[in-house]
Amino acid sequence: MHESSQQQLNPVWDGVNRGFGKRVVNIMAKRIIQFGTSRFLQAHADLFVHEARETGQDIGPITIIKTTRGRERDERVAAFGSPAGYPVIIRGRISNVTIEDQLTVKSVEKALMVERDWSELRTLFAYDAEIIFSNVGESGYTLQNGDRIDAPISFPAILLSLLHARFEAGGKRLLILPCELVSENGKVLRKILVKLAEEWKLGKTFGEWLETKIVICDTLVDRIVSEAIDPVGAIAEPYALWAIKREPTYDIPFIHPAVVVTDDLEPYLRLKLHILNLGHSFLAEIWLTEKRPHDETVREILSDVEIKTRLLELYDKEVLPGFAAHGLANAASQY
């Protein structure tokens, strides 16, 4: 679970090898509450927890929370409660070998709705939760004018209200792992919570508890989850990464090949931005300017030898030298 070499900048997990880690005895499960029902988390964090549980690690189960109001995704919420689990299909290529493997994820116990199940959620959060996941999108950090501690609307307000309930119930420590694609997402979320706590006048003692007992890590997630499966499930590419910035006061309580705990997220961020995202932007520009077929996929556009050559030349001449200058040549080439 620690970063020990440059090679670990690119943990390639094929979604098939479940033989990682030593099997351990499950003594007391670490219950997780997850805000967000997205297909991304279904094929990312939720799948990782399932894999860890398969080796006997004491992590989970997960209770998923639908924070948005309205009836959309109600069918998905109900489906999360099936003991049969849900499918995740890992489809793509590893080392020039095409793979397609279907897994059944059973780490999710149930799903709740904030507007319907607030009392149950409040009790679960106050007394039983040990870890929080979230993926509510960039706009999910935006506060709402009507937010109140007794009637929160936005995700940060919901989270702060639940944290206050936990504080009043005895205030056990808690680990929060935000998965939103926001730079320094942990720091950003903490800043919002602290400011809102001041506005709500929750008091100095609560503020100190929030600072010392609630661990919020910066994280970076990476995986292409191309398609949802109705009512619940997803299709994803083989490559996956969850880079978590190390907190000296709290160990990440499970291991998985795609999870890396590091003192520095910057190299992972640069690889994602300047190789993966740059490549997508480059291809999108070609697709637009050359008026290529509207339904063309990435695989199809890269089957054009001339375009693939242009992309590889961009990487070789303009991207890889920059990484090499910072001692990341091997990591960038593998990525």
Per-region residue spans from a language model:
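Substrate/ligand-engaging "lid" and interaction regions
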Residues: 5, 9-335
